[in-house]
């Protein structure tokens, strides 16, 4: 079966929508491409995040450029030997994990917000297998290159701020800092 090409230039309302499916569309490259465009901040909540996924390197590069990078990881997944926790903390990326006793058993989100202007959601864990061998998906909502349509910018910002508020809520209500 021939892989389908990604859907390009599709809007819902005023927000650009770009669905991608792994392994055919290499969603990891889309994450990296969008993080390279970031100007101020990257916020994320991820269930599984492995070292050398490519996404961790892009976050480290963003932090080295002076961007704020903040994330929430699942407690059990973050403690695995293959997890990106140490790489990210070494780069001074602010990390949290779900606390025990809060009623939150797992952080199962796969959610990223870039510059409060773009939201990336889906089933895609931040791992090599998710990109190469799993059937996974992401939906990119927004366009970081959009600068000439105030109504569309407001719509994507509203959506991104709503998603970041969920990340912030989880950190405040159920999170604890990862210090090492």
Question: Can you annotate each of these PLM segments?
Answer:
Residues 1-30:
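Short, compositionally biased "basic patch" segments
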Residues 27, 32-41:
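Secondary-structure "cap/kink" motif recognition
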Residues 1, 9-11, 41, 53-180:
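PLD/PLD-like phosphodiesterase catalytic module centered on the HKD motif
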Residues 48-49:
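Long, repeat-rich segments with strong aromatic
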